[in-house]
């Protein structure tokens, strides 16, 4: 994840077009021919979303209250991590391969990450990852826009296929410190921000971009919190 200064604007983490829609479709309308790409390169090599873009997207988002959480279950977004591109690798391992360095793979596997190093974006600290029953949770894959948050802000109306694609969309996923991810829970920008302040611009811009691509809405408090962060981004130096 790389931040660059371009034309005086802070350019943030590269993002895939979230829903990878084909012409004639809109967010929430699944296209059965769309496949999620294998993400093995840093996102910044594919595209970039700037603070300026995120500010504009934020102002275009619908603002209203949360819908009831009634009916929410993780399985509404699919049965765990999927293999949407049918390459034999589940999304969790694809994100670990993308975000960790110095990785080793399980013997005989092209997918399963046995160990690696993470520079955690949420805390700014380094984490040694070792796969195992008692150690894997040290690094978790976070949905930047939490699934429960999405459920209460538009995803209830999606098809099951769209929800599964959202849950496995690399643009909305980050490998992060496990305890910090647990503390975040299903918080939005109004209720939780990364402790690592230098990453907050990137984090909020990613949330806004994902919500814009999937036509999710924000609450008034969330809108105001995201705006405060984005308006202050010019004062922040790159995180890397």
PLM region descriptions:
Residues 22-89, 222, 238-240:
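N-terminal module-boundary/linker segments of secreted carbohydrate-active enzymes
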Residues 113, 122-240:
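Domain-level detector of nuclease and nuclease-like folds
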Residues 54-58, 92-96, 100, 226-233:
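Generic structural signal of hydrophobic/aromatic residues within well-ordered alpha-helices
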Residues 47-54, 112-116, 173:
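Compositionally biased, low-hydrophobicity segments enriched in charged and small polar residues
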Residues 1-28:
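Alpha-helical transmembrane anchor segments and their immediate juxtamembrane flanks
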Residues 16-19, 90, 168:
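Intrinsically disordered, low-complexity proline-rich regions
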Residues 6, 61-63, 182, 193:
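Alpha-helical interaction segments
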Residues 68-140, 144-145:
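Secreted/periplasmic proteins that engage bacterial cell-wall peptidoglycan
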């Amino acid at each position: 994840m790389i931040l660059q200064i371009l034309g005086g604007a802070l350019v943030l983490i590269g993002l895939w077009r979230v829903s990878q829609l084909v012409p004639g479709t809109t967010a929430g309308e699944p296209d059965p021919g769309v496949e999620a790409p294998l993400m093995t390169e840093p996102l910044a090599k594919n595209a970039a979303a700037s603070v300026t873009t995120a500010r504009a997207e934020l102002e275009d988002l619908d603002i209203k209250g949360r819908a009831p959480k009634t009916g929410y279950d993780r399985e509404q977004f699919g049965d765990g991590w999927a293999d949407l591109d049918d390459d034999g690798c589940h999304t969790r391992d694809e994100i670990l391969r993308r975000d960790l360095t110095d990785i080793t793979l399980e013997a005989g596997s092209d997918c399963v990450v046995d160990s690696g190093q993470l520079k955690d974006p949420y805390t700014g600290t380094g984490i040694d990852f070792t796969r195992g029953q008692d150690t894997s949770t040290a690094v978790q894959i976070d949905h930047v826009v939490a699934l429960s948050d999405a459920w209460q802000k538009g995803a209830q109306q999606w098809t099951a296929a769209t929800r599964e694609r959202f849950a496995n969309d690399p643009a909305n996923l980050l490998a992060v410190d496990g305890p910090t991810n647990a503390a975040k829970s299903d918080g939005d920008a109004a209720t939780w921000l990364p402790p690592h302040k230098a990453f907050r611009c990137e984090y909020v811009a990613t949330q806004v971009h994902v919500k814009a691509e999937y036509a999710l809405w924000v609450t008034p408090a969330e809108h105001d919190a995201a705006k405060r962060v984005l308006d202050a981004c010019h004062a922040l130096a790159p995180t890397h």
